[in-house]
Amino acid sequence: MSRKATIERVTKETQIKLSLEIDGAGEAKICTSVPFLDHMLDLFARHGLFNLQVDARGDIDIDFHHTVEDIGIVLGQALKEALGDKKGIRRYGQASVPMDETLASVAVDISGRPYLVYHVALPKVKIGEFDVELVREFFQAVVNNLGANIHVNVMYGDNVHHMVEACFKAFARAMDQATQVDPRIEGVMSTKGKL
């Protein structure tokens, strides 16, 4: 079973092509023109063992908002398409990741019901040129388009880069767990018979 998807999104604000292979080796080729986002997507692929290619162009002369949000949209769509009928997946994943002084935790339920809980109090508004409020926008876009319940929490931390990076690493590891196929599961992991 090949769990792959390629999604293209073209609007007046962005042009994005994203290819995802769930059962990958952590290989990434990322070009978004938003260097900090490139870094986060690269480590998402590596720590989740997903193969991920992203080629994105957007109206970054205005700001990074449309590009970041639209990549979240397309990543959510790609995950949903690659998972297909979701038969046999574990559905749930959870990971806590330390990064120096920071501890972040992400829990995922690929339930078909989009809901984001985001408890991340970042002490600064920017990382370089990147507006940190866009981290929430990214996760909200993934949640809405995958149809998942995702909780993102930073328990403590001081360095804003470490805090965001720990969130993306925890997200990668939790998503890796949730998307794994368990041979013991017949159908889908729900008493309703549908996700």
Curated annotation (Swiss-Prot):
InterPro entries listed in its UniProt record = IGPD_sf (IPR038494), ImidazoleglycerolP_deHydtase (IPR000807), ImidazoleglycerP_deHydtase_CS (IPR020565), Ribosomal_Su5_D2-typ_SF (IPR020568)
Q: Which UniProt keywords apply?
A: Amino-acid biosynthesis, Cytoplasm, Histidine biosynthesis, Lyase
Signal sequence range: none
Subcellular location, record wording: Cytoplasm
What general EC class does the enzyme of this chain belong to? lyase
Keyword set includes Amino-acid biosynthesis: yes
GO CC terms of this entry: cytoplasm
Its UniProt pathway annotation is: Amino-acid biosynthesis; L-histidine biosynthesis; L-histidine from 5-phospho-alpha-D-ribose 1-diphosphate: step 6/9
What GO terms are given for molecular function?
A: imidazoleglycerol-phosphate dehydratase activity
Q: Where is it chiefly localized?
A: cytoplasm
Q: Tell me which Pfam families the record gives.
A: IGPD
Q: Does the keyword Lyase apply?
A: yes
EC number per UniProt: 4.2.1.19
Among the GO biological process terms of this entry, one is:
L-histidine biosynthetic process
SUPFAM superfamilies reported for this sequence: Ribosomal protein S5 domain 2-like
Reaction(s) catalysed by this chain, per the record, are:
D-erythro-1-(imidazol-4-yl)glycerol 3-phosphate = 3-(imidazol-4-yl)-2-oxopropyl phosphate + H2O
Q: Which NCBIfam families match?
A: PRK00951.1-2, PRK00951.1-5, PRK00951.2-1, PRK00951.2-4, PRK00951.2-5
In the record, the note on similarity to other proteins reads: Belongs to the imidazoleglycerol-phosphate dehydratase family.
Q: Can you say what this protein is called?
A: Imidazoleglycerol-phosphate dehydratase
The scientific name of the source species is: Geobacter metallireducens (strain ATCC 53774 / DSM 7210 / GS-15)
Q: What is the lineage of its organism?
A: Bacteria, Pseudomonadati, Thermodesulfobacteriota, Desulfuromonadia, Geobacterales
